[in-house]
Amino acid sequence: LSPFLLGSFDVDDNEVKANKLNRIGNIFVSDESYIALEKWHNDFLKDFCLKSRTIVPSEYIAEIGKKLSDKRSVLYWAAKNEVPIFCPGFVDGALGDHFFIFNEKRHADEKLIIDAAADLTKFYKLILEPKRIGAVILGGGIAKHHLIGAAILRDGLDYAIYISTGNEYDGSLSGAKPKEAVSWNKLKSSKNSVAIDAEATLVFPLLAHVWIHGS
C-alpha cells in the first residue's frame, strides 16, 4: 500500500481533496492507498469465504495478521504470538464499506455473517477470569469504553494507566480520568491508577522500554 504522508493541520482541505488525498489530522492518505486496500481485502474475503461465511472479528483479524509480512505491523506480531485483538468497532470505516459492497454482490445464501457475540464471550472471559487485572489505555473512544465497561462485571479493574490528550470537560469518555471510572465500578480505586496527559505514540514507547529493560 502507498505510504502515509506527513502533512499539516493548517491546510486548504479543498486543495487536499483536489490532490486525491484524505486528511487524518496532519496525516495524508492517498485515494490510491484506499483503492489498493479494498482490492487486497476483497481478494482476502473471497478466499476466507471458501472456508466459512461466518466472521468472528478477532479470528478474522488474526487471519489477516498471518497474511502479512511487514514486521512493522501490530497485526503481524499479534498473529505470530497468538495474541488476540478485539475490535468493538469492527464494521466502522473502510472495512465496513468493504463488507457491505461484498455482500451486495452475493446471493442471500452466500452473504457474510459477522458474529460479534462470539467475540464478546471470549473478551469477557479474559476480563472476568484473572484474579487481578489492569489495563494500559492509549487514547480512548470505543476501545476504552469496551474494556472498562466489561470490567463492571468484576467490580472494576485493579489498576489502570490512561495516556490521552483528551479532556473531560465536554463529557468525553476519551478524556475521562480514572476517578470517574470509580463511580461506575469500572475501576476499584483511583489510588492504583494514573492518567498521563500526553500523546500516546510518544509516551508509550518510553514506558514500554522501561518495563522491558528496567531503566
Where are these regions (language model features)?
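Gly/Ser/Thr-rich loops at beta-strand to alpha-helix junctions
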Residues: 91-94, 139-145
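Active-site rim loops that border cofactor/substrate pockets in soluble metabolic enzymes
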Residues: 88-135
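Ligand-binding beta-strand-loop-alpha-helix segment within the catalytic cores
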Residues: 12-94
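General beta-strand structural signal in soluble alpha/beta enzymes
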Residues: 85-89, 138, 162
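Conserved active-site and cofactor/substrate-binding residues in soluble primary-metabolism enzymes
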Residues: 19, 35, 39, 69, ...
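C-terminal functional extensions of proteins
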Residues: 132, 142-215
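Catalytic or ion-translocation cores adjacent to nucleophile or general acid/base/metal-coordination motifs
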Residues: 1-29, 158-175
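Solvent-exposed alpha-helices and their adjacent loops that cap or buttress functional pockets
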Residues: 76-79, 105, 126-130, 152-155
